[in-house]
From Swiss-Prot:
UniProt biased composition (Basic residues): 74-88
Cysteines joined through disulfide linkages: none
Known function: May be involved in MAP kinase activation, epithelial sodium channel (ENaC) down-regulation and cell cycling.
Record keywords: Cell cycle
Biased composition range(s): Polar residues: 15-28, 96-119
Source taxon at top rank: Eukaryota
Keyword Cell cycle assigned: yes
Stated name of the protein: Arginine vasopressin-induced protein 1
Species whose genome carries this gene: Mus musculus
Region (Disordered): 1-28, 74-142
Induction: By vasopressin.
Keyword Protein biosynthesis: no
GO terms, biological process: positive regulation of MAPK cascade
Amino acid sequence: MGTPASVVSEPPLWQVSTPQTRGRKQASANIFQDAELVQIQGLFQRSGDQLAEERAQIIWECAGDHRVAEALRRLRRKRPPKQNHCSRLRVPEPGSTASDPQASTTDTASSEQSGNSRRTSARAPRNWNKPGPTGYLHQIRH
């Protein structure tokens, strides 16, 4: 027995071309395929990429190649860790001078200790038996 005629004669919906889709450009697996090196560099620089030139060079050399994704992964691994975590930021005090290395190490050590004490106090378990709004709500819910 064969396949029904309706299945054989009708193309799938994704293959049917409508007047709107006939004029569209066909999708490309590599969006950088026809781009110039300067265009790719500008794209990465505008996005704030620190390695814009290096990344653009790799993509341009590998345009149309399956190695583009792997090259981008390698660059991502090379990226240094971000140093803008709030616990690492140090704001100098108005009266202190940065020229004295001994003073700056003492300030850093004391600020690290105060930062650690804040973290541990924030994680301390709460005593739900104490009178107050949180204890009262906890008793109602449980």
